Amino acid sequence: MIGGVSFIDDIRSLPDSVRLIAQFIAMVMMFYQLDILHLNMWWVVVLALIVCVGASNIINFMDGINGITAGYSLSVLFPLMLLNEKFGFVDSSLIYVSTLSVLVFCFFNLRPKGKAKCFAGDVGSISIAYILLFMIGKLIIKTTDMT
């Protein structure tokens, strides 16, 4: 869902309100998948929704600088790969495919003298943000540790 809305936003600009509503709905669906919507402390879920939607938009804003989206994504994916070997919180193929995808993107985005061949756009940066947030959420749930 979020990929489709972001794709449309890349083709023709959507109002911020439409994008934010779609992002919140997608995050609620992710929280449902993570099975954290039943928490008795509803305010924690609301705060987590705001933080996660904000984090996904921060990654989207970084896409305009060559290599920064890929660099930050890899700096999260490599530790997640190592932690997954120990805790097994997601299927390892999800991390491997995500890492390889970001590495290929990095090849075209990180170029000398600011001449990037491509950018992720909204569809790429928001999608990778949601994938990273999903994996981090699974890790937090598996280890019950937020630090």
Regions found by a protein language model. Name each.
Residues M1-T147:
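"…together with the soluble PPM/PP2C metallo-phosphatase catalytic core" -> "…together
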